[in-house]
């Protein structure tokens, strides 16, 4: 069997409880690339027992940097499509089928749409982006990209925008974006957003930056 044209990028930091199951769960959809962000709980060692490609940071660089590392690797290694998902097991991965479908049909960017969100600030962000741009869940960890969209901008997320910066630029430039429903379950382990107060501050900052980029489409 030849190499897949789909790379599935999974950022992981201290996800030993779920990483093996997640890696095995998604490998039927494409080649799995796991970016270990200097975990200390054995995540890396568990990844080495799977068929996934392991990319490792030498220090803890954060969620956005992990996604950027994986996506850059996928593009440099000539994968046509890149799908991101989280390592915590929260996202039910049969939702990847919808992402793959839209990518294969020619969509440049596909955004997952979760059936529930954990925080009111996430609900607010989604409400605002839906009202203005008809995108309901910009913070969903499952997204799909044609590699050409990365090449167009040359970066993924340089502003620590929880993986939404490339989406914001795509909205600004009227890139065709498709949403697909994703089912979630209660996550295991610590949230990528941190505690309730820190997540409120972090997401509020992202909302400000996101609209600062994307809303230029409306005022140009």
Q: PLM features: residue spans?
A:
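Conserved donor nucleotide-binding strand/loop of the catalytic core
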Residues: 44-77
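Short, well-formed alpha-helical segments that are part of the catalytic scaffolds
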Residues: 9-28
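Acidic helix N-cap motif at the loop->helix transition within catalytic regions
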Residues: 17-21, 41-50
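Conserved catalytic loops of nucleotide-sugar-dependent glycosyltransferases that act on lipid-linked
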Residues: 66-67, 117-219
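Conserved donor NDP-sugar-binding/catalytic core segment of glycosyltransferases
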Residues: 97-119
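Short beta-strand-to-loop acidic/aromatic patch adjacent to the donor-nucleotide binding site
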Residues: 79-90
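Cell-envelope/extracellular polymer assembly enzymes that use nucleotide-activated donors
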Residues: 5-7, 165
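A conserved acidic beta->alpha catalytic loop
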Residues: 36-44, 89
């Amino acid at each position: 069997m030849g190499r897949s044209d789909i790379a599935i990028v999974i950022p992981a930091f201290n996800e030993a409880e779920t990483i093996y199951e997640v890696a095995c769960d998604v490998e039927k959809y494409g080649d799995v690339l796991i970016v270990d962000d200097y975990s200390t709980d054995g995540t890396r060692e568990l990844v080495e027992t799977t068929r996934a490609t392991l990319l490792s940071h030498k220090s803890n660089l954060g969620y956005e940097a992990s996604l950027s590392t994986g996506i850059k690797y996928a593009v440099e290694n000539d994968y046509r499509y890149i799908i991101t998902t989280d390592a915590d097991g929260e996202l039910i991965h049969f939702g990847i089928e919808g992402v793959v479908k839209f990518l294969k049909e020619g969509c440049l960017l596909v955004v997952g749409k979760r059936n529930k969100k954990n925080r009111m600030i996430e609900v607010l962000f989604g409400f605002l982006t839906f009202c203005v741009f008809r995108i309901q869940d910009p913070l969903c960890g499952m997204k799909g990209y044609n590699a050409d969209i990365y090449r167009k901008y040359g970066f993924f997320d340089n502003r620590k925008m929880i993986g939404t910066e490339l989406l914001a630029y795509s909205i600004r430039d009227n890139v065709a974006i498709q949403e697909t429903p994703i089912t979630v379950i209660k996550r295991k382990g610590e949230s990528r957003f941190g505690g309730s107060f820190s997540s409120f501050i972090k997401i509020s900052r992202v909302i400000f930056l996101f609209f600062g980029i994307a809303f230029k489409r409306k005022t140009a």
